[in-house]
Curated annotation (Swiss-Prot):
Superkingdom of this protein's organism: Eukaryota
PANTHER family assigned to the protein according to its UniProt record, in alphabetical order: OX-2 MEMBRANE GLYCOPROTEIN
Protein name as catalogued: OX-2 membrane glycoprotein
GO CC terms in record: axon; cell surface; neuronal cell body; plasma membrane
Signal peptide start and end residues: 1-30
Description of how the protein assembles with itself and partners: CD200 and CD200R1 interact via their respective N-terminal Ig-like domains.
Disulphide-bonded residues: C51-C121, C118-C136, C160-C214
Keyword RNA-binding tagged: no
Residues of the Ig-like V-type domain: 31-141
Positions in the Extracellular compartment: 31-236
């Protein structure tokens, strides 16, 4: 009598594990990767955002959308059949600078604060559906800096103001002794921020001929702004009052002498 013997592989668990690993590798390999890069550009200059489909998948249409609170907003599409199609709200504002179904670049002609945000590029591929990537655009404004000083009776006020986006930071390069500092921050409707720092120096005479150095930090870069304190602008209030009083007294004496002289002349026969 024959017996049917079924031999099970000794390493069946390892074989099954290997199958699962291979399936996972195939699945991961099949996943399409989209490479993007965030950009930071200056206000009122051109800007570009790029998207690249890394895997050799067949894309049929490329769509760019702007992310918004409710739902993404279509901006522009590109396909071989229809070419570039720009939505009315974005005409004369953007264009697709790189025409391709694997690599796509949109260009803003002149960015404004409204253009700041994140954008999605969607590759509509055959067999894998829509594969998307996200690139974000940040808008900045270079600092506009003013530096001036003013003498008063017993102290010197030096003011440094910087307006930029994002908000700048203002420092002073001065000795620590006898100096007080106050800072005011003001946000503007156009998205910029003004930071004003005022130095109160108690011994103004010692600052004559020296430089007032204001340091502005913006986007990781520190810039020095210098101004030499001119003694021609310095005066002492008590000294000024003394001079004015002396001049007034001399004028009164002159008037009195002139009046007496003419009075004596009138009395002579």
């Amino acid at each position: 009598m024959e017996r049917l013997v079924i031999r099970m592989p000794f390493c069946h668990l390892s074989t099954y594990s290997l199958v699962w690993v291979m399936a996972a590798v195939v699945l991961c390999t099949a996943q399409v990767q989209v490479v993007t890069q965030d950009e930071r550009e200056q206000l009122y200059t051109p800007a570009s955002l790029k998207c690249s489909l890394q895997n050799a998948q067949e894309a049929l249409i490329v769509t760019w959308q702007k992310k918004k609170a409710v739902s993404p907003e279509n901006m522009v599409t590109f396909s071989e059949n229809h070419g570039v199609v720009i939505q009315p709200a974005y005409k004369d504002k953007i264009n697709i600078a790189q025409l391709g179904l694997q690599n796509s670049t949109i260009t803003f002609w002149n960015i404004t604060l409204e253009d700041e945000g994140c954008y999605m590029c969607l590759f509509n591929t055959f067999g894998f559906g829509k594969i998307s990537g996200t690139a974000c655009l940040t808008v900045y404004v270079q600092p506009i800096v003013s530096l001036h000083y003013k003498f008063s009776e017993d102290h010197l006020n030096t003011t440094c103001s910087a307006t930029a986006r994002p908000a700048p930071m203002v420092f002073w390069k001065v000795p620590r002794s006898g100096i007080e500092n106050s800072t005011v921050t003001l946000s503007h409707p156009n998205g910029t921020t003004s930071v004003t720092s005022i130095l109160h120096i108690k011994d103004p005479k010692n600052q004559v001929g020296k430089e007032a150095i204001c340091q502005v930090l913006h986007l990781g870069t520190v810039t020095d702004f210098k101004q030499t304190v001119n003694k021609g602008y310095w005066f002492s209030v008590p000294l000024l009052l003394s001079i004015v009083s002396l001049v007034t007294l001399l004028v009164l004496i002159s008037i009195l002498l002139y009046w007496k002289r003419h009075r004596n002349q009138d009395r002579e026969p």
